[in-house]
Amino acid sequence: MDKQRIHFIGIGGIGVSSLARYFLAQNWAVSGSDASKSNETRELVRDGAKVLITHKPSNLNPKTNLVVFSQAIPADNPEIVKAKRLGIPVISYPEALGELTKQYRTIAISGSHGKSTTTAITSLIFRQAGLDPTVIVGTKLKEFGGRNFRLGKGPYLIIEADEYKDSFLNYHPEAILMTNIDREHLDHYKNFAGVKRGFKNFSKNLDKGGVMILNRDDSPVRNLFKSDKRVIWYSLKDKKTSNLISKVIKIPGRHNVSNFSGAFKLARHFGISQKNILKAISSFKGSWRRMEYRGQFKIQNSHAYRQAGKFKAKVYDDYAHHPTEIKATLSALREAYPTSPLLCVFQPHQSKRLKVLFKEFTESFKEADITLILPIYFVAGRDVELGKWNSEALVKAIQKKYPKQKTFYLKDPKNLRNALQILIPTFGDESCAPSSVVKRPINRLGKPVIVVMGAGDVVNITPSLLE
């Protein structure tokens, strides 16, 4: 008997690729296409998928049973056009995932920020408790073999529920964990009222008798659901829980303690013991592109650093692309490295986001001693140049607001290594930045810390910095 065939358009995306792996695990014949090769497409080939680069009608096998497309794919994509002409069912990634949520006891992790890490730790807690969940998440976990998917034999499906284009309205969960609500995806929602309305509508998808685990510390969440009877609240003000987590958590940042508090409350609701929860939290060392330690950058030009025996800077990679996320990551790194100079390399993601949140972006880099801003990453089909709303304007605005802080525009990311070799030796100079850290004598400074941030192709730059 022939295998069932499924074809994914935009298979290299972090969400779509996880669903492709689900169908591979179910022994379907999986094919897909993407605009360019990437680590994700190469890994999918190793996992058993047939991946074709560029979109064209010939990519689609006429015997395909189902076509699933990424939200980033336009309706006139040649593979979609051919599938419809042949009468092959065509659905979006959220619609496909939505069908899966009906087959499991689904736990949906939502929120403007922190979804991936919270989904990851929730999954590991359930695994630690022996509940063997199936997991679809927007990051990669070492515990899942460096993948964004896990097939379990238990009744639970734990998913990351993205709000973009109202994706989460396709899902039918037994439980919702909501970390926060912020001014994000305004290209779709238009304004903050629209964002809040989207989350409110999502709550209506909760199964009868279901529960919502919500962050009381987030005022939009608190105000939106203050009279909802289905809610279990969590908060950093719950010192008993937050202190337990703070004692065992391995990754820095109050936002992570908050998110893990939500996972703690959720797990307790499902009868998981405190012992298993804390064991999972204590063993979690982070996930892909979430303040991920990547290696070290060798400092060539600093005589002072060589004298002090500090030849290398630590390099982190982070997905932050919204002001709230940038501030949270920089604060967490400052908490982890209180005596280290902190250098941030940031690639803005979408000119529309930069325009709408320009003031907030200007105020996001306060914790960094030096900031390098790269050109905007434009998202195909979702973005256009918006004149004065660009990286150069952001640099000027930051320089005006924080005149003592060193902020630069780096037009060509290929020059990043050279820029770092020039800038890192300036640490220890009284004029470097307003931070008290960089005013220490250089022999009392910790090793410099570099964090490379953004949701675009900046991820491909980080390896070039490593030894």
Regions flagged by a language model, labelled:
Residues P62-L66, G446-K447:
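Short acidic/histidine-rich motifs immediately flanking catalytic phosphotransfer sites
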Residues Q4-L19, A29-A35, S287, P323-T324, ...:
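Active-site beta-alpha connecting loops in nucleotide-dependent enzymes
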Residues K50-P62, D412-N415, A419:
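Short acidic low-complexity segments
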Residues K3-R5, I9, L44, S70, ...:
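Adenine nucleotide phosphate-binding catalytic loops in nucleotide-utilizing enzymes
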Residues H303-K312, T426-K447:
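Short Gly/Ser/Thr- and charged-rich N-terminal loops/segments
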Residues D2-R5, Y22-W28, V45-R46, S58-P62, ...:
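Phosphate-binding loop of NTP-binding sites
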Residues S33-A49, G145:
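N-terminal beta-loop-helix "entrance" segment that forms/cooperates
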